[in-house]
Amino acid sequence: MAIPDEFDIIVVGGGSTGCCIAGRLANLDDQNLTVALIEGGENNINNPWVYLPGVYPRNMRLDSKTATFYSSRPSKALNGRRAIVPCANILGGGSSINFLMYTRASASDYDDWESEGWSTDELLPLIKKIETYQRPCNNRDLHGFDGPIKVSFGNYTYPTCQDFLRAAESQGIPVVDDLEDFKTSHGAEHWLKWINRDLGRRSDSAHAYVHPTMRNKQSLFLITSTKCDKVIIEDGKAVAVRTVPMKPLNPKKPVSRTFRARKQIVISCGTISSPLVLQRSGIGAAHHLRSVGVKPIVDLPGVGENFQDHYCFFTPYYVKPDVPTFDDFVRGDPVAQKAAFDQWYSNKDGPLTTNGIEAGVKIRPTEEELATADEDFRRGYAEYFENKPDKPLMHYSVISGFFGDHTKIPNGKFMTMFHFLEYPFSRGFVRITSANPYDAPDFDPGFLNDERDLWPMVWAYKKSRETARRMESFAGEVTSHHPLFKVDSPARARDLDLETCSAYAGPKHLTANLYHGSWTVPIDKPTPKNDFHVTSNQVQLHSDIEYTEEDDEAIVNYIKEHTETTWHCLGTCSMAPREGSKIAPKGGVLDARLNVYGVQNLKVADLSVCPDNVGCNTYSTALTIGEKAATLVAEDLGYSGSDLDMTIPNFRLGTYEETGLARF
């Protein structure tokens, strides 16, 4: 079908939010309404790297074709490193390639935005509208059961799930039924996933909203591999977008095409790209735009500011050789891969139907733990967290394998503790360096530039390390991926114990347990059993580690050297008063209806609109913003009542999966 040059509505960016907006609006009861969805990446339909949940780590590789990697300025807070922040580059955005973890924000998160229509109570009907909750539920008033996005445990659970939960419970972290109830901030749970259990497939935004609509409607036009250069503004009104090929034929003289919008343009390019599009369009800090050769149209200093993320780090551990993990599969073992693919294609179950992240916690410190923090952090905690008991400080979860480059570690079986800071105090920015859409931005994510972010990450390392050491599967620490404690420190990371090492090696191995004291020290045996030092299934425990100030310094150094993005960035087009607010001090970009200040018919809708952080994996928030934005656009067009349902056609088994789909 030929793509016309003019539409009623143009949605620029086919990520998690953009797909939701375009899919909903194309289902308005108006056969003459046309919607264009413009996406820089490729179409994701029938892509096994998308729909198979268990292959998601491949999308994190630096040579991935499904992500764009942005490099930051060098940072003193990261010991001189540059942060690398990937952004999805495929239809469906992050929902096509993320970790698939189902997590929802705390109620106070949305309330704190203080924007009309955006409180948790007001958003709850839209949050429920998103999902089909595919598990028994005691909170039916908080979940949805007929939405386009499916939520389940997948069709396979690694045994590290119950092992982790027993260990966490022994630390005083209660195991709860529903940690995503908007209020529980301290607990452990069997973690749900954005996976359709009926199909064994990832539940991404494009397959949920866009592809079903395009199979049933003629009103939605999809334009892929196309980058937005700028919005064209005439007499204060957004009237068109100028686009260029995603891959430049001639970067110095880009070939462009302009698409006009009769009613509305919605920018949904993500936290890094949305402010860059606005800046190239003449919307941003006027002095900066002039300095890079762009004529200012609207002076909005907040564009590109207030960059936030969740700060993540990983710590791996050995597990006993009989513990199932995904290591052999991701390492490329042909037997493991054939078995997993055969099981998925035959039954839609097995290890390819999970992300291997089976259990996790949200935690807040006790008064005793908080007393060990520095004074600056305690003041910040008192101001931000004390009166908001629904906000967790940290998250960590167990991954059933080594999450990282397997060429850098020996063969074996592992588990990885995956941590992220829920509400960092640090802030950053992203700015264009020229009017050329292919030029890299000036980017400083601000990771750890506020030292108050260090104590909770040190605390989480200690907490998760004790969880790991209390797990029955625990067999030692991958010392190369832990802090560099002093040799004589009791906190020093230790390798496989002797018995486990021998079990891995087998009877014919000649060098297993060869003593090489300058390189490795085995883990101690667990302490003798006593009533106060066992988990609920009577597993003996290793003694708790006591840390010195010197040990804490080693952990801080490790965190500075290894903290990275969690792919959860937000905030650069903040929905806040134009003059700014406490949570968006450099100025707001959007009003409560997502309109860009000073321009008619132009909205922004993606995670960049969040003026403050959310304590969750952000796919749920991106979808919530999408549902809200679709409603706002429809209301602007004059729709109300049941017309705002904009029901998506059902995703039916076999609709997208072609017979004989080639395996990897």
From Swiss-Prot:
Its main location: other. SUPFAM superfamilies: FAD-linked reductases, C-terminal domain (SSF54373), FAD/NAD(P)-binding domain (SSF51905). Induction: Induced by methanol. Subject to strong carbon catabolite repression. May possess two different forms of flavin adenine dinucleotide, classical FAD and so-called modified FAD (mFAD), a stereochemical FAD analog, in which the C2 carbon of the ribityl chain has changed from the R to the S configuration. Conversion of FAD into mFAD was observed both in purified preparations of the enzyme and in cells grown in batch and continuous culture. The relative amount of mFAD in the enzyme varied from 5 to 95%, depending on the growth or storage conditions. GO terms for molecular function: alcohol oxidase activity; flavin adenine dinucleotide binding. Gene3D superfamilies: FAD/NAD(P)-binding domain, Glucose Oxidase, domain 3. InterPro entries: FAD/NAD-bd_sf (IPR036188), GMC_OxRdtase (IPR012132), GMC_OxRdtase_N (IPR000172), GMC_OxRtase_C (IPR007867). Its cofactor is FAD. Pfam families: GMC_oxred_C, GMC_oxred_N. Its EC number is 1.1.3.13. A motif (Microbody targeting signal) lies at residues 662-664. Pathway: Energy metabolism; methane degradation. The C-terminal peroxisomal targeting signal (PTS) is essential for the efficient targeting and import of AOX into peroxisomes via the PTS1 pathway. This is Alcohol oxidase. It comes from Pichia angusta (Yeast). The lineage of its organism: Eukaryota, Fungi, Dikarya, Ascomycota, Saccharomycotina.
